[in-house]
Amino acid sequence: MTKIKIVVIVGPTAVGKTALGISLAKAFNGEIISGDSQQVYRQLDIGTAKATQEEQEAAVHHLIDIREVTESYSAYDFVQDAQKAISDIVSRGKLPIIVGGTGLYLQSLLEGYHLGGQVNQEAVKAYRNELEQLDDHDLYERLQVNNITIEQVNRRRAIRALELAQFADELENAETAYEPLIIGLNDDRQVIYDRINQRVDRMLENGLLEEAKWLYEHYPTVQASRGIGYKELFPYFVGEMTLAEASDQLKQNTRRFAKRQLTWFRNRMAVSFTAITAPDYPQVVHDRVRDFLGQKEKS
């Protein structure tokens, strides 16, 4: 089976994935698929660092603004949506470029999670329904029985981890349809932390506070409100923190998130990284993509 070539750009938040994705889309006749769990939500633009209108006009973007904030979204949903987007892009003779920092989503797509050729979908659904009927105590007992630990304990993550364990053999044998070129972006820790701090300041200047307040007043308990960029500001709205304290908390949580992202990509996806401050960084990446596609450099 001839596999579909796709480019995947990963790295910590604020590293510059969107800009690189647009650059590659222009150079290689590509379209971008967002691989971010929060950018699917309509009306949440600033806190999710969604591509701006100008950026979306510079390159076609998929899987942005496809859910209401009241809806849930999972790795399973992403794999289904991403597969459809990839098929659509390829059918028009273009290159799919996935840009995102949600490691589980990307790994699920690239390794055939749920949708691999040999995974029985009815069995997956039946097992998920069984897990959803369990109370929290029984669900976490299942985790212990299967020797599963998850970084952040909640029902959604617990069920997903148990599904992966239950169908591990099928997933290992499932044939993925894609041949990915994974491009990792990173730099010295202080460079990334400075970029994060500057981004948070820009977000606040551009209206993040108003966006977060709207979410807090209308939908404070939905899945979308638990994303970094919103929940840190909620204490400010009820007088438990000053704005400066909430801003510092947001920066700190984002830095911690960036560290977790890097750990995931290194351990789960074996990504090698390119430093964004290297003088030849853009050219090196473009050359890698050109070689991957078997193209010659234009004279």
Swiss-Prot record:
Site (Interaction with substrate tRNA) location in chain: 102, 128
Keyword Acyltransferase: no
Enzyme class: transferase
Catalytic activity: adenosine(37) in tRNA + dimethylallyl diphosphate = N(6)-dimethylallyladenosine(37) in tRNA + diphosphate
Ranges where the record places region Interaction with substrate tRNA: 36-39
Reported cofactor(s): Mg(2+)
GO molecular function: ATP binding; tRNA dimethylallyltransferase activity
Binding site for substrate: 13-18
EC nos: 2.5.1.75
Binding site for ATP: 11-18
Record's keyword terms, sorted: ATP-binding, Magnesium, Nucleotide-binding, Transferase, tRNA processing
InterPro entries, per the entry: Dimethylallyltransferase, IPT, P-loop_NTPase
Keyword tRNA processing tagged: yes
Biological-process GO terms, alphabetical: tRNA modification
Family: Belongs to the IPP transferase family.
Self-association state and partner proteins as the record states: Monomer.
Purpose: Catalyzes the transfer of a dimethylallyl group onto the adenine at position 37 in tRNAs that read codons beginning with uridine, leading to the formation of N6-(dimethylallyl)adenosine (i(6)A).
Protein's name according to its UniProt entry: tRNA dimethylallyltransferase
The species this protein was found in: Streptococcus pyogenes serotype M49 (strain NZ131)
